[in-house]
C-alpha cells in the first residue's frame, strides 16, 4: 500500500474509533460537574430511597461476584484437568449463549408470584426480596460461566498441567494445588474477569428491573430513572448516583486487592505437609448443573411461549441492528489490528470494565448535541461501544497467534502489506472472525439502555419488550419475547459454525 493511502487509512481508523469511544469524555464530565456542589450531594443523601437502594446493590453485587468465583473455583478443583473438564468446557456455551434478559426471564417465570413454583408449591414461594438476593444468585450462576470461560483459556497452558501432575504425584490435595499453583498462575486473568463482573453487576438495569427489588430498586435502576426524567434536579441526582456506582467499583477493587494481599500472606510454604483430600462432590454437581441451566431456560421458554403474539417490529429491529453493529465492528477491528498501534491500548477495554450507566449518559449527551437522538443510526452507534471490546476479546488472541513465518515468506515474495493482509491474514482469521461476529451480534441483541435512551423509545427490540413485559402481563407473551431474544443469537452462532465448517472442507488448511 502506498504511504499516503496508508496514512489516510490510519487517520480514518482513528477517527472512527474516536467517534465510537467519544462518549467516555462527556461521561466523565457528566459525573464530575454535579459532584463539585455540596448541595447536590446533600439532595442525593436526603432521598429516602437511597439507603435501601444502596444496600440492595451491595448485597446483589457481592453475592454475584463471590458466588461466581466460588462456583468457578469449585468446578476447577473438581474437574481440571481431565476428560470431565473438557466435556464441561464443550458444554459451557449452552449457558454462555443465553442472553442475561432471557435467563432472568426464565428465573422470573419459575420463582415469582404467579410462576411455575407458585402454581405447584405456593408455600415455597420466596418472600419479598428487598435485598436483591435473587438477583445476586441469578447473576452468580450466569457469570460463573463467563468466569470459567476466561479461566479455561489460561488453564490450557501445558506448563500448568505439568506442575499440577508433579504436585498430585507428591500427594498434595487439590485445594493445596489451588493455593500454590492455580490461583497465582491465573491471578491477572482472574482479576480482569472479576472487575468486569463487578462493574456489570453494579450497573445492570434490565436484569435488575426483571428480578431486583421494585420499590426502591437497586442504585443503578434508580439512577436510570432519575437520569431519564425531565427535571434538572432529578438528572443531577442521577448523575451523582452514577458517580456513586463508580466509587463503589473503586471500593470493590481496593477490597479485592487487600483480600488478595492478605490471602497471599497466609499461604503456607510447600513444606511437605499433606492435607487430607476434601470431597469433590459440590464441584462435580455444579459442573453438571451449569450447562443444564441453559438447556432448561430454552425448554421452559419454549413451553410457555405464545408464538402468535411475537412482535415482528421488535424482531426485525433486533436482527438488523445486531447484524449491522457486528459487521461494522468486525471490519473496523480487523483493520485496527493490522494498521492500528502495535502496543495494547487499555482504553479499548473501558466499556466492559466500567459501569455502563455513565457511558450511556455520555452517549445521550453527544446524541443530543448532534441532534441524533431518536434515530436508528444513534442506536447502532450506541451498541458499538460494547460490541467492539467483546469482539476484540475474541479477535486479538487469534491475531497474535498468526505464525510470523508465513508473513516473512510473503514478504520475501515481494507482497505488499495490504496483499499480505487480504490473502494471508484474513483467511487465517476467518474462523475467529465468524465467532467474533456471532458474539458481537449477541452483545448487540442484549443492549437495553442504549436502545431505549438513544432511540427515544421509537425502536422496540426483543430486549426492551421483554423488560417492559416483565413488570406485568401475559407470561406467554413475555416468554415469547425472551425466547426469540435467545434464539436469534443461537441461530447466528449455528450459521457461523456451518460457514466455518464449509470453508474448512473447501480449504483444507483451515480445518
Could you say what each language-model-derived stretch is?
Residues 30-40, 112-123, 214-221, 265-270, ...:
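Peri-membrane helix termini and adjoining interfacial loops of integral membrane proteins
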Residues 264-276, 457, 500-511:
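Short cytosolic juxtamembrane segments of multi-pass membrane proteins
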Residues 156-161, 165-186, 408-429:
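Short helix-to-coil transition segments within interhelical loops
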Residues 43-46, 164-169, 180, 224-228, ...:
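Short amphipathic alpha-helical coupling elements at transmembrane boundaries
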Residues 4-35, 45-156, 189-205, 212, ...:
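Membrane-water interface segments at the C-terminal ends of transmembrane alpha-helices
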Residues 226-243, 247:
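Helix-loop-helix hairpin linking two adjacent transmembrane segments in secondary transporters
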Residues 258-288:
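Flexible interhelical linker loops that connect adjacent transmembrane helices
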Residues 204-233, 446-476:
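Glycine-rich helix-loop "coupling/hinge" segments at transmembrane-helix boundaries
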